[in-house]
Amino acid sequence: MTDISVQSNTALESSETTHFGFTTVAKEEKVAKVAQVFHSVAAKYDIMNDLMSGGIHRLWKRFTIDCSGARPGQRVLDLGGGTGDLTAKFSRIVGEKGHVILADINNSMLNVGRDKLRDSGIVGNVHYVQANAEELPFPDDYFDIITISFCLRNVTDKDKALRSMFRVLKPGGRLLVLEFSKPVFDPLSKVYDAYSFHLLPKMGELVANDADSYRYLAESIRMHPDQETLKGMMQEAGFENTSYYNLTGGIVALHRGYKF
C-alpha cells in the first residue's frame, strides 16, 4: 500500500510556556526539542527499551493488546507508535479486512518502524502517517481502537490531543493510554528515582552515545500527570467508563476509556 505522509500546517503561534523535562520553555521550543530527542534515539530505540525495562515493556504492551478487545476487520490507530511494536500485533489480529495506521510526529521513528515491520513481512493492512496528536488528520468517528504508548508525556498540549483522539474514535470505540506513571509504593519510588536519574543517563551514553536524551526521559516521566489526574483529563475530553491498571507497582499505568 502507498504510505501516507501528513503534517499539520498550523503554525505554533502561542507565546505560552510549558515544560521540557524540568526546564520551562516556550511551547514551540518544546516541539523542536522533543523532535530532536527522538531523531537522536530512533536508531537505538528498541535496544534501549529492552535494556531499560529488562524486556518488561513487552509484557506491558501485550497487556495493552489484551485490553484492547481488537477483532478481525477493525480499524486501529497506533498513535505515537514509533517503531511499531503494537502495530505489528494489531496487524495480525485485524487481518486482511482490518486496517492499522501507525502514526508518529517524528519521521525518524516512523522510518525505523516502517523498515522494521516490512522486514518482518508485515505489509498490506498497515499505513504509515506522520501526524501531530493534537491535530489528527482523520475523519470523525473513524477508528474502533486508539492506542498511544509511551508518547503522551511528550505531547505539548495533552488536553487538546485527548480531544483530538476522542473526535476520531467511533462511538463504542476505546482509547488505551500506556505510559510511565507514579509508583504506588514509597520504597519503589526511591529505587526508581535512583535508577532513572543516575543509571539511565549513563546507559544512554554507553549504548546510544546520548545521555541528555535519556535524562530528558527521566524528567518527562516525573512531569507527566499521575494516574488519577490523567483519568480526570480523559473524562474532561469526553471519555466514559475510564479506568486504569497499575503495572509493575505503578511505574507504568494503562488507562482505558470509551466513547459512547
Curated annotation (Swiss-Prot):
Enzyme class: transferase
Record: residues binding S-adenosyl-L-methionine: 83, 104, 132-133, 149
GO molecular function, one term: 2-methoxy-6-polyprenyl-1,4-benzoquinol methyltransferase activity
Keyword Nucleus attached: no
Matches recorded under PANTHER family: 2-METHOXY-6-POLYPRENYL-1,4-BENZOQUINOL METHYLASE, MITOCHONDRIAL (PTHR43591:SF24), METHYLTRANSFERASE (PTHR43591)
Role played: Methyltransferase required for the conversion of demethylmenaquinol (DMKH2) to menaquinol (MKH2) and the conversion of 2-polyprenyl-6-methoxy-1,4-benzoquinol (DDMQH2) to 2-polyprenyl-3-methyl-6-methoxy-1,4-benzoquinol (DMQH2).
Gene: ubiE
Domain of life from the UniProt record: Bacteria
NCBIfam families per UniProt: MenG_MenH_UbiE, PRK00216.1-1, PRK00216.1-5
Any matching Pfam family: Ubie_methyltran
Biological processes, Gene Ontology terms: aerobic respiration; menaquinone biosynthetic process; methylation
Record family assignment: Belongs to the class I-like SAM-binding methyltransferase superfamily. MenG/UbiE family.
SUPFAM superfamilies in the record: S-adenosyl-L-methionine-dependent methyltransferases (SSF53335)
Catalytic activity: a 2-demethylmenaquinol + S-adenosyl-L-methionine = a menaquinol + S-adenosyl-L-homocysteine + H(+); a 2-methoxy-6-(all-trans-polyprenyl)benzene-1,4-diol + S-adenosyl-L-methionine = a 5-methoxy-2-methyl-3-(all-trans-polyprenyl)benzene-1,4-diol + S-adenosyl-L-homocysteine + H(+)
Keyword Transferase: yes
EC code(s) of this entry: 2.1.1.163, 2.1.1.201
Protein name from the UniProt record: Ubiquinone/menaquinone biosynthesis C-methyltransferase UbiE
Species annotation: Vibrio vulnificus (strain YJ016)
Keywords linked to the UniProt accession: Menaquinone biosynthesis, Methyltransferase, S-adenosyl-L-methionine, Transferase, Ubiquinone biosynthesis
Metabolic or biological pathway, per its Swiss-Prot or TrEMBL entry: Quinol/quinone metabolism; menaquinone biosynthesis; menaquinol from 1,4-dihydroxy-2-naphthoate: step 2/2; Cofactor biosynthesis; ubiquinone biosynthesis
